[in-house]
Amino acid sequence: MLDANKLQQAVDQAYTQFHSLNGGQNADYIPFLANVPGQLAAVAIVTSDGNVYSAGDSDYRFALESISKVCTLALALEDVGPQAVQDKVGADPTGLPFNSVIALELHGGKPLSPLVNAGAIATTSLINAENTEQRWQRILHIQQQLAGEQVALSDEVNQSEQTTNFHNRAIAWLLYSAGYLYCDAMEACDVYTRQCSTLINTIELATLGATLAAGGVNPLTHKRVLQADNVPYILAEMMMEGLYGRSGDWAYRVGLPGKSGVGGGILAVVPGVMGIAAFSPPLDEEGNSVRGQKMVASVAKQLGYNVFKG
């Protein structure tokens, strides 16, 4: 049994130590994100048996952004299976920025990872759907099943994203021209943009992690969301590419599958045990929350979790 006092103490200490850490800046290329108050910070644990511990602004709702890629990858694995995802999208780190097109050019137009923009757009196109709205509703539903029913699209975030997503539209057309997109290019880009524009809070984000930690069963609803056999593929991708250019450093220092988003959220999974999540808007140059990384790493270190430890 996990010690409840120790878990609450871990989140309290992480928050106290790092919630006002200086450094980083909000994402400024998406107008909505640029205007989120930079002083906000939160950290939370949800255990695989459904206990919740949090500190800070844990009820504040922020844009899910790239963490949504984890949810869409999970749905694609359910729909088409791990082999098809690997064959049609890939399962390798790019070593390049999350929105780079260079990796596409170097590999004949094939994306390498579902957790960078090109691969995520391709993954969105793999979802079984007869039309745009069905594709979107299925992705929203998997987000809600994994994290909580309150997860919903923000029209304000979506509008802010849709009017600035020219680079992603270009990526979609490159994928389409190379034969690695499996629906209309602009449909894929539209739905991908929507999936990034949902709002979540830190406890719900930790619940998403706890659902993965529990082998695909949401510990708060007790409902199976994913096949247990598909979860290791998700965690492997998170370990390889979840924090973009910081992924290797994260694996080296923290040793947990993780995923960040430019909305300021960051998630880590302790398989079989818990999800750890944090939120704070200022980002490092790779697009990861400066305070969030520190808070999640602090919780993991205090509790002694690292998947590479014996």
From Swiss-Prot:
Top EC class for this record: hydrolase
- Cite the binding residues for substrate: 66, 117, 161, 168, 192, 244, 262
For this UniProt record, the keywords arranged alphabetically read as follows: Acetylation, Hydrolase
Single annotated GO MF: glutaminase activity
Q: Which GO terms describe its biological process?
A: glutamate biosynthetic process; glutamine catabolic process
Annotated signal sequence is: none
- SUPFAM superfamilies in the record, alphabetically? beta-lactamase/transpeptidase-like
Among the Pfam families in the record, one is Glutaminase
For the modification N6-acetyllysine, the affected residues are 294
Q: Which reaction does it catalyse?
A: L-glutamine + H2O = L-glutamate + NH4(+)
Q: Which InterPro entries match?
A: Beta-lactam/transpept-like, Glutaminase
| Keyword Translocase attributed | no
Key word Lyase present: no
Q: Which cysteines are joined by disulfide bonds?
A: none
Q: Into which family does the record put it?
A: Belongs to the glutaminase family.
Which NCBIfam families does this chain map to?
A: Gln_ase, PRK12356.1
Subunit record text: Homotetramer.
Q: What is this protein called?
A: Glutaminase 1
Organism, by scientific name, is Escherichia coli O6:H1 (strain CFT073 / ATCC 700928 / UPEC)
Gene name linked to the record? glsA1
